[in-house]
């Protein structure tokens, strides 16, 4: 039963690694069209698209990011069809804010590249996979459970970041240019440091 002190919200600054994934995507496009398969036009998703696009533009100012809305968090058919529509328009990189691997599978079948989401999904479309903004909820859950069992949990709002490890970037594909990998590492450290 909620009593005002035993309830809290936890979420993360996923826009931080999304920016970095945009840098990788910007380096990988030859057509300068990147398709972004997104669930719903809500602040979390729009924030991620904006961060991704800024990362793309840091590396490749000529590249464009075009969004297709699916109106679902998980529907592999809709996600795959949406990715295919972008590929048919000439996109050679597909990014996503979805929960299945369908966009990546379509990208791989077309010989395109893919920025996944949620976890390292490289095993699902290894030839297409570039990287992914990822979550690591384990330490946060352990912290909250530890506080709750010790009777010290105070609730409140937790807004995790790359600095505390709640969000991060999956390993970058080995064929991404070393200068881009170095630029991403430098920008990541700046984000963590707040500089």
Give short role names for the model-derived ranges:
Residues 1-195:
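A residue-level marker of the well-folded mature domains of exported/periplasmic proteins
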């Amino acid at each position: 039963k909620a009593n005002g002190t035993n309830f809290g919200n936890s979420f993360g600054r996923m826009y931080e690694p999304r920016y970095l994934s945009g840098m990788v995507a910007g380096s990988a496009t030859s057509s300068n069209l990147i398709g972004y398969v997104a669930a719903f036009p809500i602040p979390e998703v729009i924030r991620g698209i904006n961060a991704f696009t800024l990362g793309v533009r840091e590396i490749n100012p000529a590249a464009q990011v075009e969004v297709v809305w699916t109106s679902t968090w998980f529907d592999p058919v809709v996600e795959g069809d949406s990715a295919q529509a972008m590929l048919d328009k000439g996109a050679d990189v597909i990014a996503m804010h979805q929960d299945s691997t369908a966009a990546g599978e379509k990208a791989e079948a077309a010989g395109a590249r893919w920025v996944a989401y949620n976890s390292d999904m490289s095993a699902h479309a290894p030839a297409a996979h570039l990287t992914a903004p990822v979550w690591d909820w384990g330490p946060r859950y352990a912290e909250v459970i530890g506080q709750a069992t010790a009777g010290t949990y105070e609730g409140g709002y937790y807004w995790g970041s790359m600095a505390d490890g709640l969000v991060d970037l999956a390993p970058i594909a080995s064929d991404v240019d070393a200068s881009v990998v170095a630029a991403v590492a430098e920008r990541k450290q700046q984000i963590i440091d707040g500089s």
